[in-house]
């Protein structure tokens, strides 16, 4: 899901927001942005479910799950602020928190797959 989220976001970034386009490009970027938003809500729900299901894990792993959830929330908020305010700093924060979430959830996956 995180890789698809990244690709959708890059598609919107390359083409531009719907308000910046006309014709077919406006339709395409609107669809990409809509899918990007829906997937971000799915990531938020997934992070919440991971946190709820982390009860039987040890403290270190629960902290990793919490960190991943926080990074997803930060990325979501930064994305909203980037779209609303248009500042590249919010886009940078969104990218950094996305990369952090990708690394944290990757580490969680590898650790639990070995067990």
Walk through the language-model features, giving the residues of each.
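Polytopic transmembrane helical bundles with strong interfacial aromatic enrichment
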Residues: 1-115
